[in-house]
Amino acid sequence: MNYHIIKLYERLLYMVIIKEINQFDMHRLVELSLMWEKEDSCYGYRANTEDDLRDRYILAAYDDELIAYIFGKEEIQEKQTSVIDKNMHYFEIEELYVHPSYRSRGIGKQLMESLEKELKKKGLEMMMLNTATKNWKAIMHFYIDEIGMNFWSAKLYKRL
């Protein structure tokens, strides 16, 4: 087998079903959120309750069960910024999480690509997010190099 065929084969192995979450799977999303909180990989992350997820657009990845999710909501920009026009409708990604056993398999990228397609269908022209990850180098590589997002700003701190 040559390299390209192997890579294609690996990619096919990790194709998951991505669809809008149903009410029956909300408890599993909350379980994944609790798992994320226990990882302590983000500053100040607090696990979600089902109430936290009301009025959110949620896509989930399935491999027999829910293994990853992305959610957020549509926002309207109140004032002009350097990258967002006043009154522009955009999508704010609030969370993207992949179960640790399924990471580095392209599932997060599949979720982002699926979300982008859905947002384009709705006529939105921009999606954005903030991140509080402790592994900022890896997350910047993912969002900028793999997903094609642009860097806008950063907030840094130093405890004294």
Model-found features: residue ranges?
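Acetyl-CoA-dependent GNAT
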Residues: 16, 20-27, 31-94
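Conserved N-terminal entry element of GNAT/NAT acetyltransferase domains
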Residues: 1-24
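Conserved beta-strand-loop-alpha-helix junction that forms the acyl-donor binding cleft
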Residues: 128-139, 157-160
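Conserved acetyl-CoA-binding loop-helix of GNAT-fold acetyltransferases
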Residues: 98, 104-117
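Active-site/acyl-donor-binding loops of N-acyltransferases
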Residues: 146-160
